[in-house]
Swiss-Prot record:
Family that this chain belongs to: Belongs to the universal ribosomal protein uL23 family.
Protein name, per record: Large ribosomal subunit protein uL23
Molecular functions per Gene Ontology: rRNA binding; structural constituent of ribosome
Subunit-structure text: Part of the 50S ribosomal subunit. Contacts protein L29.
Domain of life: Archaea
One Pfam family named in its UniProt record: Ribosomal_L23
Length: 95
């Protein structure tokens, strides 16, 4: 089976469109060390992981994605325990 590659996106700023700052996103940030982003529709999980690691100088443990009913792609990014999602949120200006 041929290996699939994601889109050729050079700049990590092009992958992550904007952070989500809803009540649920804040609860996930505090309880599960997860950040929530709206990302490009054609971005895959390895590309999202690489973009978050490059932009925020953190290590990512896991990425979950979904397509919202409005057609946007949402990514839940779980950071490794030695990094805090709240610190990244402060840098983003959402906390």
């Amino acid at each position: 089976m041929a290996k699939r590659y994601g889109p050729k996106i050079e700049d990590p700023h092009d992958v992550l469109l904007y952070p989500v700052a809803t009540e649920k996103a804040m609860r996930l940030m505090e309880a599960e060390n997860k950040l929530t982003f709206i990302v490009r529709r054609d971005a895959n999980k390895p590309l999202i992981k690489k973009a978050v690691e490059e932009l925020f100088d953190v290590e990512v443990e896991k990425v979950n994605t979904l397509i919202t009913p409005t057609g946007e792609k949402k990514a839940y990014v779980k950071l490794k325990p030695e990094y805090r999602a709240e610190d990244v949120a402060v840098d983003l200006g959402i906390l």
